[in-house]
Curated annotation (Swiss-Prot):
Tissues in which the UniProt entry reports expression: Expressed in roots, leaves, flowers, immature seeds, endosperm and seed coat.
Chain segments carrying region Hexokinase large subdomain: 226-472
Domain Hexokinase: from-to ranges: 32-483
PROSITE patterns the record matches: HEXOKINASE_2 (PS51748)
Keyword tags: ATP-binding, Glycolysis, Kinase, Nucleotide-binding, Transferase
Family: Belongs to the hexokinase family.
Catalytic reaction(s) noted: a D-hexose + ATP = a D-hexose 6-phosphate + ADP + H(+); D-fructose + ATP = D-fructose 6-phosphate + ADP + H(+); D-glucose + ATP = D-glucose 6-phosphate + ADP + H(+)
Pathway stated in the Swiss-Prot or TrEMBL entry: Carbohydrate metabolism; hexose metabolism; Carbohydrate degradation; glycolysis; D-glyceraldehyde 3-phosphate and glycerone phosphate from D-glucose: step 1/4
Keyword ATP-binding: yes
Name of the protein this chain belongs to: Hexokinase-2
GO MF terms held by the record: ATP binding; D-glucose binding; fructokinase activity; glucokinase activity
Residue positions binding ADP: G101, T102, N103, T250, G437
Length: 494
């Protein structure tokens, strides 16, 4: 009897051991598959120094091609007609209007010249009623002009408009426009939920000016710009060595100061300054040297603009979290990363926003508590292991650092085009103004951009290159450009 019982116990123990071994083998295979996905991702995203130099070289080549002729490059290299950036000498009251989405901002600033600088500024933000986004052109611009008129009416005693002068406005219009002068441009098409057919092909400055006249508001639009050029203007106002601006936020773009005689497609008279600001629209850059993965290709194919904005889809805040989601989905499907069932929410495109990715990536707690909390909040995944959380952080690290490497390579391309990527004997500073939430708030990303650029340039050159955070280009930058292109500028210079 005892022998039988002992045999039964031994058999049960053997079964238990076998089950445990099988479970451990299954677990090992699962982690092996997840690790294989991670290793392949790391390999495909790799951007060693040689490859980054090829990307920078390709950017410089495309810049040359885009300046030579319209349509000659994936980079539009748009002539902005901004031939003068703020010098710091500007004085007076100037306004800005920033229209780029469902809200718009109005801003006024009192400038006091070299000594006073920005004496005071005020702003207001107004929501656009949804029906005006798809109504008539007059209705939309009348609403904007009416809001601007109310804002002007609240102008206090701290703001001093010189006697006999017209108020002047910088207009940041973040929609596709064919610029025809510093203060005119025709709308190519609406985006971001706007759909007003009668405005397409019309000069948006003329539309705004007519609406201002209907409100009885005596105000002249002296500059039509986008947010990137505004960032360049704001950066130059603060630091005379700023030569380029880069937006690294939800989207991405770059603008820089070019010599007008180095723009073959410019057929007008050379500006007095000899300079011209170029809006690169660099998000549309592409090159065979860009490290693409299956996840990037699928994201691009399923996007609203397949084959377009490839660079932007690799480096901007709109897409980084989505790339991470796609990698984690593959791990969940092929390696049961989050258990036997794939979390339903993980199948929802763009559910992992880049700010969430940043929080997980920057988690420094020993048990990666923030990662666990975010996986629970966003995906509904309960009780993840530390090993799983580490894997998620690794995915974020690979995706974010590839983006930072490529952003740095793009900046290097601009420096190369301008001949600022080689040592100069007088140690002249070169400053790049950067704006955007991705750069401002995602610390690991920003630090990686800076360290990668330093490594690419080498010690001698990098000691003269500065990347500087420049906030609110679309607001203060527009007002500063209104001042720099004031109709009274030449009279003041006499």
């Amino acid at each position: 009897m005892r022998k039988a019982a002992a045999a039964a116990v031994a058999a049960a123990a053997a079964v238990g051991v076998a089950l445990l071994v099988r479970r451990q083998l299954r677990e090992a295979k699962r982690w092996g598959r997840a690790d294989a996905v991670l290793r392949e991702l790391e390999e495909r995203c790799a951007a060693p120094p040689g490859r980054l130099r090829q990307v920078a070289d390709a950017m410089a080549v495309e810049m040359h091609a885009g300046l030579a002729s319209e349509g000659g490059s994936k980079l539009k290299m748009i002539i902005s007609y901004v031939d003068a950036l703020p010098s710091g000498e500007e004085k007076g009251v100037f306004y800005a209007l920033d229209l780029g989405g469902t809200n718009f901002r109005v801003l006024r600033v009192q400038l006091g010249g070299k000594e006073g600088r920005v004496i005071k500024q005020e702003h207001d933000e107004i929501s656009i009623p949804p029906h005006l986004m798809t109504g008539g052109s007059n209705e939309l611009f009348d609403f904007i002009a009416s809001s601007l008129a109310k804002f002007v009416a609240s102008e206090g005693e701290d703001f001093h408009l010189a006697e006999g002068r017209q108020r002047e406005l910088g207009f940041t219009f973040s929609f596709p426009v064919k610029q025809t002068s510093i203060a005119s441009g025709t709308l190519i098409n609406w985006t971001k939920g706007f759909s007003i057919d009668e405005t397409v092909g019309e000069d948006v400055v003329t539309e705004l000016t007519k609406a201002l006249e209907r409100q009885g508001l005596d105000m002249k639009v002296t500059a039509l710009i986008n947010d990137t050029i505004g960032t360049l203007a704001g950066g130059r106002y603060d630091d005379n060595d700023v030569i380029a601006a880069v937006i690294l936020g939800t989207g991405t773009n770059a603008a820089y100061v070019e010599r007008a005689n180095a723009i073959p497609k410019w057929h007008d008279l050379l500006p007095k300054s000899g300079d011209m600001v170029i809006n690169m629209e660099w998000g549309n850059f592409r090159s065979s040297h860009l490290p693409l993965t299956e996840f990037d290709q699928a994201l691009d194919a399923e996007s609203l603009n397949p084959g377009e904005q490839v660079y932007e889809k690799l480096i901007s805040g709109m897409y980084l979290g989505e790339i991470v989601r796609r990698v984690l989905l593959k791990m969940a499907e092929e390696a049961s990363l989050f258990g036997d069932e794939v979390p339903p929410k993980l199948k929802i495109p763009f559910i992992i926003r880049t700010p969430y990715m940043s929080m997980m990536h920057c988690d420094r707690s020993p048990d990666l508590r923030t990662v666990g909390a975010k996986l629970k909040d966003i995906l509904g995944v309960q009780n993840t292991s530390l090993k799983t959380r580490r894997l998620v952080v690794d995915v974020c690290d690979i995706v974010a650092k590839r983006a930072a490497h490529l952003a740095a390579a793009g900046i290097h391309g601009i420096l190369k085009k301008l001949g600022r990527d080689v040592p100069n004997t007088d140690k002249q500073r070169t400053v790049i103004a950067v704006d955007g939430g991705l750069y401002e708030h995602y610390t690991i990303f920003a630090e990686c951009v800076e360290s990668t650029l330093r490594d690419m340039l080498g010690e001698d050159v990098s000691s003269t290159i500065v990347i500087k955070l420049a906030k609110d280009g679309s607001g203060i930058g527009a007002a500063l450009l209104a001042a720099a292109h004031s109709q009274y500028r030449e009279a003041e210079e006499l």
